[in-house]
Amino acid sequence: MTQMEPQARMETGAATEAAPGVARIDVEAVSSKSSRSLYAGRKKIYPKLAHGTFRSVKWLVMAVTLGIYYLLPWLRWDRGPTLPDQAFLLDFANQRLYFGPIEIWAQELYFITGVLVLSALGLFLVTALAGRMWCGYACPQTVWTDLMIVVERFWQGDRNARMKLDKSHWTFEKIWKKTATHLSWLLIALATGGVLVFYFRDAPTLAMELVTGEAPAVAYVFMGIFTFSTYLLGGIAREQVCIYMCPWPRIQAAMYDQDSLLVSYHGHRGEPRGPHKKGQTWEDRGDCIDCKACVAVCPMGIDIRDGQQLECIQCALCIDACDDIMTKVDRPLGLIGYDTFQNIEAPAGSPRKPLRLVRPRVMLYSGLMVLVAALMLWAWMMRSTIEISVIPDRNPLFVVLSDGSIRNGYTLKILNKTHDERTFRLGVEGLPAFQASIVGFDQADAPVAVEPDSLRAIKVYVSVPPPALAKLAGGATPLTLTVTDVENGDVVIRDTAFRSPGS
């Protein structure tokens, strides 16, 4: 008879049953409070495959998020013959962001800021309502780690098989399984790094250049960095990123309140825990049979029965594992489940308080999100298709001409954010008497044409004759430059100053 590995024997031997037909898994909570140490070496976690509602939700979220990430750069959007047709493109060369019909210029980065603020507030709101649900389901670290574990499970088997393989000597079987696993991880990491650079240039064009070796060196460098990062963080580091590198577990405590839904162990129902023998009643004991299925499926290596912990990402796989065991032993579901702090901490036998969605913290985050969204909508509706900047000459501030006139120079930049050529006229206001001229034009009010999607800079000179100098306000007189669209009459106004002696 072949001697079994200790781990396999613990799960299959009748002597270690937690209940009739339910094996007690010999698993250690690697990240438990009792074993946590700043200088402790890492103990590898072997999460077991879970089945149930929350695992199905995680499969769905993983498929959707990965699908969006890998496919989005390949989607096309027709913007005309002179513009890129990639649906989402962060075009650094032309300083623009394209997202479907939306086109954001570098001068409009406040929209990106608004999106980031909305995202942060949304994260705060989700945390206040349901804990670290973002971490457990949609965080890129979680999604890619989950994907790497799927690949590892495909080549090496589930928890017991992987543990047995790691403990075995370096045989041919171990070598090819480990090699296949790491090669698969590298291919996933390479695809991830390659797709990421596609967000910054036309995907089909850059893909061909990468294959033929004609892509810019910076594309290969960043692709290599992202490939290495994905392989290291998703395949090797895994839970260490969440525990030690990510600041969010430390911040989240400030986002909770007594009504936040968290994955929790109901100790008043589960204790005292212990194996349940055949024919034994459930009186004077808890429903927890100490099978440790919740620990075995946890990707963070914690024991949820120890209470709320920094390492818990609220993935709820322990709920699926526990519900499966409760079904087998014919006990009510929900020994581990989503519940609020006030219900978890309530004395045994006290009535369960209903969830309050309307509360100050939730209303604050929701109100701020509505406010930011409204401001962004207003800014978008008021968005101008013309951007004007006026840069006065600094050295010198002014020039004294031979006839005694004072002349100031200004560089006027006109940005046409439309896809059609536009013509503008310049106006000057605020001086008692002046002469204006534009370099390269016969008259100051000559039409200035600006090409589509382009910036044109013109040099403007404004001179004040000697008789009018006495009427100027000190050394800096307010001056207004107006740019008017000849076709539709749109006017953009910029204030500056006319410098004279005394400035």
Please provide the spans of the model-predicted regions.
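Short acidic, flexible loop segments centered on an aromatic residue
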Residues: H419-F434
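Asparagine-centered strand-capping/turn motif at beta-strand->loop junctions
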Residues: I414-T418
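Intrinsically disordered, low-complexity Pro/Gly/Ser/Thr-rich segments with frequent PxxP/GP/PP motifs
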Residues: V439-A468
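Terminal connector regions
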Residues: V464-S503
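Hydrophobic alpha-helical transmembrane segments in integral membrane proteins
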Residues: A374-F398
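Short aromatic-acidic-glycine turn motif
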Residues: V399, G430-D442
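Membrane-embedded alpha-helical bundles of multi-pass integral membrane proteins
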Residues: T2-P272, I319, P332-M369
